[in-house]
Amino acid sequence: MEVQLGLGRVYPRPPSKTYRGAFQNLFQSVREVIQNPGPRHPEAASAAPPGASLQQQQQQQQETSPRQQQQQQQGEDGSPQAHRRGPTGYLVLDEEQQPSQPQSAPECHPERGCVPEPGAAVAAGKGLPQQLPAPPDEDDSAAPSTLSLLGPTFPGLSSCSTDLKDILSEASTMQLLQQQQQEAVSEGSSSGRAREASGAPTSSKDNYLGGTSTISDSAKELCKAVSVSMGLGVEALEHLSPGEQLRGDCMYAPVLGVPPAVRPTPCAPLAECKGSLLDDSAGKSTEDTAEYSPFKGGYTKGLEGESLGCSGSAAAGSSGTLELPSTLSLYKSGALDEAAAYQSRDYYNFPLALAGPPPPPPPPHPHARIKLENPLDYGSAWAAAAAQCRYGDLASLHGAGAAGPGSGSPSAAASSSWHTLFTAEEGQLYGPCGGGGGGGGGGGGGAGEAGAVAPYGYTRPPQGLAGQEGDFTAPDVWYPGGMVSRVPYPSPTCVKSEMGPWMDSYSGPYGDMRLETARDHVLPIDYYFPPQKTCLICGDEASGCHYGALTCGSCKVFFKRAAEGKQKYLCASRNDCTIDKFRRKNCPSCRLRKCYEAGMTLGARKLKKLGNLKLQEEGEASSTTSPTEETAQKLTVSHIEGYECQPIFLNVLEAIEPGVVCAGHDNNQPDSFAALLSSLNELGERQLVHVVKWAKALPGFRNLHVDDQMAVIQYSWMGLMVFAMGWRSFTNVNSRMLYFAPDLVFNEYRMHKSRMYSQCVRMRHLSQEFGWLQITPQEFLCMKALLLFSIIPVDGLKNQKFFDELRMNYIKELDRIIACKRKNPTSCSRRFYQLTKLLDSVQPIARELHQFTFDLLIKSHMVSVDFPEMMAEIISVQVPKILSGKVKPIYFHTQ
C-alpha cells in the first residue's frame, strides 16, 4: 500500500488516482543545482507532470505534437538549443545539455492485445495503458520536471515569492492547489505561444533569482528556507561542493535520474536490479500478474514512475533519456542497501503537502509499498527468527523469494534484497497473495515449482517441520516454545528428521511442541542436562553421599560433630538463616536443622554396614542354617533396625518442626468480633505457609504425586492447626486457655466474643486430653505427621497405593515409639488405642471449624472480617468438598 504523507496525518492511496506533491520536483531540482553549479542548458526530454491526469496528458501531447517533432529534429541535427522562456508556473534553471534521441515507437506486447500510443506503457500488475513521459515544448503547460523547480500544481510561484511561502506553509489548503492546477492547464498553451511570438529568450529564473551567476547560492538559500519552514535540519546542505556525494538516506540524495557523472556509485547495482525487475515484469501477461498485482503493482509501478532508462528496461529504455522519478524519493524501496546511511537520524517525520483533498479510505486491494527508514541489513538471526513470526517466511527473506513478490526470474532474485512480511494466509488483510507459478510472499516465479532454496539450507514445507540439514543458526533462536534449547544430536545446527511423523498430529505450521503434550516423545530432562553434584546443605560441590545425603566434606564433618556432641545450638534469629557456601558457618543451629531436613542421620552408615553384614551372613549360612535359626536371625536384624531407625526418624521430626508464629494482633485495642476473627485468619495464612514447608520436609512426602501433595495439604491443614494449637495450649497455659499465638490467646471472654464458643470448648477439651493422657513430645510429633495422611477424597488420589504405603509406615513408626519405652505388649496396645482415639477426635472438631469458616467467608463483607487471599481460595474451593462428603477423613475406630 502506497502511503502518502499529509499535513499532520497519513492518507492512504485512493483506488483510481495517486496524489503526488510538488516537493519531489522541488527537492530534485535543488539537488541537481547544488551538485552541478554553473550555467547549463535545459534537458531535451523529461517526464510529464506527475499531477496531470491521463486525459490531460493526451490533450497536451496532441497540442504540442508539431513542436515536439521540431524539437526532435533539432536534436537529431545536433543544433544547440537556446534558452526558452518557460511558463509562468515554472522557474527554469540552466542545466547541462543532454543530446536527445529520437523516440522510437514502442511495440505492443503480443499477449496484451493492446495498441498503446507512442510513449504509453502498460502499468505493471494492471494491464492498463499508461502515458509515458513525452518531451514537451516550451509553451506546454507540462514543463520538464528536470528544468522546473516546482511542478504544475504550483503555477504562480515563479512570479511571486509570497505565493511560495503561502503554499509551502501549513496554512495552505488543498483547494488552492487544485484551482492553480486547473488554471495552469488552461493558460499554459496561450502563454507559451505568446512568449514564442515575442521571441523573448529570457528565463523566469533570471527574474526570480537575479541572474545566472548566483544560481547555486540562491538555490541553497531557497533549499534552506524550505527546510526551515518544514522543520527539517539544514546541516546536510552546509559546505557542499560540486563533486560531493550526498548520503542515500537523505531527502536530498541523488537518485537514478541524475546524470551518470554525478550519480553515486552504490546506486549503480540498484539501477540494474530495478531495471531487471521491469524487464521481467514487462514480459509477463496480465493474467500472470493479476494474482499478485496488489504487491507487484505497487512496487513495479513505482519503478516505472521513476523512469529507469539507464538499465535498458522495456518501458523506459527505448527513449534513451534520463528521466527523474515522479514519486517521492522518501519512499525507499526494499532493494536499497546503503551502508553509509545514518542510523540515528530520521528524515521522514515531517509533514508534506499533498496536491489534493484527503483521499477516501483505503481500497480493498491496496498496493503493497513498504517505507523503510533503515537499510535492509537483517542478519541470519532475523531470518531464523522470522520463522516464528506470523508474517515471516524464511524462503521470502533470501534466495528465490528475495526478489520480491512480483519477481519472476532468478536473476532478479539474485540481485535484490527484497523481502516481504506478508504470507498467503494474510490475503484478506493485505490483498490477495500470489499462488502457484507467479507466487507472492515467498514463492517467487522460477523457483515456485521446485521450492525456494535459501542460503540457510531450509525450505518451508507445506506441512509440519522439514528435517533438512544445512547451515542453520543457533537452535535456541528459532525453536518453538516448549522445546529445550540443547539438542542431543551430533550437529547442533541441524533438525532431527525423525520428528516429522509424530509432529503431524499437532496444530500449527511447526507443531505445538510443549512438554505437557509431548512428554512421551521427549527424552527425560536429565538426558539434556546432567544432574549437578552439589551439596544439599550449602550448595557447594558435593564429594559424595555422606550419612544418607549428598553433601560436601565440610557439611559431612560438621554433621558428625554436631550430631554426636551434646552441645545444644540455638539460632539468634528466627530459625530461617540462609545456609550457603559463604554463610554456612554463621548459624550452626540452622545448618544442623537443614542437615536433618536433607535426611542426614548418624545411623545411616551403621544401617548400611548392618545390611551388608546381613546379606553376607545369609549367603554364607544359607546351606547350613535351619528354618528356625533363619527366622530368628531375621527378627533380630529387624529388631536392631527398628531401634536404630527410631531416633533417626524422631531427629528428623524435631528438626523440621515449625517455630512459633505470631498473629500480629493488637492487644491494646478493645476486643471485637471482626478484630478477633481477622487476626485468626491472618494467623491461619501464616501458619499455612509453615505447614507447606513442614510437609515437604517429611520423609517420603515428596515421593507422592504433585497433585496428591497439594490435595493432602489443602484437606488436612485445619486438623493440623487445631492439633498443634492444643499442644501449645497444654505446654504453655496448661490447657486453661487457647494458645493460638503468643499475641493471640483466647480466654472465656474472647471465646464468647468470637461467636465460636462451642468450637473453642471442644478445642480446649482436646488440649486437656494431652495432659490426661500424658502425651510425650515424641508421640505428639509422630501423631501430627500421621494426621497429615488421615483425610483423602472418596474417589482416591492419583497414586493411592503409594499413599497407603506411606501412611502405613507412619503408623508403624508410631507403634515403635510406643514400644520404645514399654516392654509389656499389653500396655503398648492400650497406648496405641488411646493415641488413635485422640487422633479420631480431631476430625469432628476440624469439620465444625470448616463449616464455621465457610459461613463466615460468605458473609465476611457484612461483618467486616478480612480473609487473606490464600485462605479465601482454599476455603471457597476445597472446604465445600469436605462439607459435601466428597472428601472424608480416615478413622482408626468406628464412629
Swiss-Prot record:
Region (Interaction with CCAR1): 567-894
Biased composition (Polar residues): 201-211
Compositional bias of kind Low complexity: 44-81, 175-200
Zn finger region (NR C4-type): 535-555, 571-595
Region (Interaction with HIPK3): 547-637
Cross-link (Glycyl lysine isopeptide (Lys-Gly) (interchain with G-Cter in ubiquitin)): K821, K823
Compartments, as annotated in UniProt: Nucleus; Cytoplasm
Region (Interaction with KAT7): 600-894
Sites marked Interaction with coactivator FXXLF and FXXFY motifs: E873
CDD domains according to UniProt: NR_DBD_AR, NR_LBD_AR
Chain intervals for the UniProt region annotation (Interaction with ZNF318): 1-562
Similarity field: Belongs to the nuclear hormone receptor family. NR3 subfamily.
UniProt-recorded name of the protein: Androgen receptor
Species in which this protein is naturally found: Macaca fascicularis (Crab-eating macaque)
